[in-house]
């Protein structure tokens, strides 16, 4: 019978390396922004608002992403940087992991638009921030950011909490306008700060916020990509 053995020293070192690796993974704590809200509120002015179809055509990339660690902020330009990972790409060639640039910082944020935090899921219409191909920002900031939410059955939706995109294009398939009870259900698993902001914005939005079923919007994106 042939037998092979690791020398005791090698076996011990291997076990130690595996233990350290497991400990390091378990010990990682998300890096969060110092505050989700700025010290003052700013009301942004935009040259135009985009429909979903217009934003898709104008974007360098469109993707469903998950926000990771807070990287830092640029107080001169009032922007904040986050790690982000692509979960599903609908247009463009985003790196699997990239830097997401959000308007707002610890000094100033827009009403009902808190800074992202680790775990936030988004559908974003992006442009290259600085030409590096590594940093991207939403075309008109919160106007082209849809939050990922889920209904009671676990089906995924993209929520236009400000109603600005849906107001420009009423013919997008899979569109629904949740009432307050449905909205509370959809944001039940969202972090409390964001859930409260969405609820507040929904009350202020005359047309109400709209949600799009993932499957219908993906088919719509596929059609837009062929144009």
Language-model regions, residue ranges each:
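Short boundary/loop segments of OB/S1/cold-shock single-stranded nucleic-acid-binding domains
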Residues: 39-59
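Structural detector for short beta-strands of small beta-barrel domains
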Residues: 58-76, 80-88
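Solvent-exposed loop/turn segments at secondary-structure junctions
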Residues: 71-73, 89-92, 105-108, 129-133
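Beta-strand/loop nucleic-acid-binding surfaces
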Residues: 95-113
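Sec-dependent signal peptide cleavage junction
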Residues: 21-42
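Netrin-like (NTR/C345C) domain of secreted extracellular proteins
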Residues: 27-33, 110-227
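Bacterial N-terminal signal peptides
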Residues: 12-21
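Bacterial N-terminal signal peptides that target proteins for export
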Residues: 2-13
């Amino acid at each position: 019978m042939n037998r092979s053995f690791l020398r005791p020293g090698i076996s011990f070192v291997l076990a130690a390396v595996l233990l350290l690796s497991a400990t390091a993974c378990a010990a990682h704590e998300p890096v969060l922004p110092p505050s989700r809200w700025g010290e003052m509120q700013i009301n942004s002015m935009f040259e135009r608002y985009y429909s979903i179809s217009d934003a898709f055509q104008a974007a360098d990339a469109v993707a469903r992403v998950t926000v990771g660690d807070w990287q830092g902020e640029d107080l001169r330009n009032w922007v904040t940087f986050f790690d982000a990972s692509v979960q599903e790409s609908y247009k463009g060639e985003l790196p699997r992991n990239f830097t997401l640039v959000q308007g707002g910082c610890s000094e100033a944020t827009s009403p009902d638009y808190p800074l992202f935090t680790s775990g936030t899921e988004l559908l974003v219409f992006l442009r290259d921030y600085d030409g590096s191909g590594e940093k991207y920002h939403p075309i008109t900031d919160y106007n082209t950011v849809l939050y990922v939410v889920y209904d009671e059955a676990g089906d995924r939706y993209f929520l236009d909490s400000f109603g600005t995109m849906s107001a420009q294009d009423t013919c997008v398939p899979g569109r629904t306008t949740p009432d307050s009870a449905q909205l509370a259900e959809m944001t039940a698993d969202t972090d409390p700060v964001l859930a409260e902001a969405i609820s507040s914005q929904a009350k202020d939005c005359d047309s109400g916020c709209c949600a799009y079923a993932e499957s219908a919007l993906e088919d719509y994106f596929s059609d837009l990509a062929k144009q």
